[in-house]
Design a protein with these regions (language model features):
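Conserved catalytic motifs of ABC-family nucleotide-binding domains
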Residues: 87
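Catalytic Walker B motif of ABC-type/P-loop ATPase nucleotide-binding domains
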Residues: 91-95
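A short, surface-exposed alpha-helical micro-motif characterized by mixed small hydrophobic
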Residues: 132-134
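ABC ATPase "signature
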Residues: 150-151
Length: 186
């Protein structure tokens, strides 16, 4: 056995914010405190960050309600708050704006931009190409377990919208519903 100094990382390498059932029998505030404790944050830091996140995400009035009583959008926001409370180097998000109202969506976009401006990296999985275009610098187009393109957004898009480029890359359905003539009203 050797002696020496053990250094503990203060910032987690990455945190994922998956679409999953959280500890929904805790209140939003309790859940944030729990997540902060998991990352060994001190109590003052936990309280400061939790209150700041609750306020920024418009969850203060619901902070003491059980998460199981939250709407889908509120649950998405508390999940994001739990992931970001430890200030990870990399944040992995699945459909970060799904189920949130437009105002909350704008707030989440601002929080993510601020996170990136502060040196963090955000990895987003989304089927909403407009969201990806508005938030991402680099993209990877993956379909059917195959990587079709990766690189800077402009390089992958090649002057087209990401939606059109995605369909082009993955060989989208050429039919596009033309056979549904009964949908036409006379």
């Amino acid at each position: 056995m050797t002696s020496g100094l053990i250094r503990r990382r203060r910032r987690p390498r990455w945190v994922s914010c998956p679409t999953m059932k959280t500890f929904d029998r805790l209140s939003g505030r309790e859940l944030l405190r729990f997540c902060g404790m998991l990352h060994r944050l001190d109590e003052a830091t936990i309280n400061e960050r939790a209150e700041g996140l609750l306020d920024a995400l418009s969850l203060t009035s619901a902070a003491d309600l059980l998460v199981c009583d939250y709407s889908a959008g509120m649950t998405k926001k508390i999940d994001l708050a739990c992931a970001i409370i430890a200030d990870p180097a990399v944040l992995v998000l699945d459909e970060p704006l799904e189920s949130v109202d437009p105002l909350s969506g704008q707030t989440i976009r601002s929080i993510l931009r601020r996170f990136v401006d502060g040196g963090g990296t955000v990895v987003i999985s989304s089927h909403v190409m407009e969201l990806v275009e508005s938030l991402c610098d680099s993209v990877a187009v993956i379909a059917g377990g195959r990587l079709h393109a990766i690189g800077a957004l402009d390089d992958v898009c090649q002057g087209k919208s990401l939606q059109n480029r995605f369909v082009e890359l993955v060989g989208g359905n050429a039919n596009m519903g033309e056979g549904l003539t009964w949908l036409r009203r006379s």
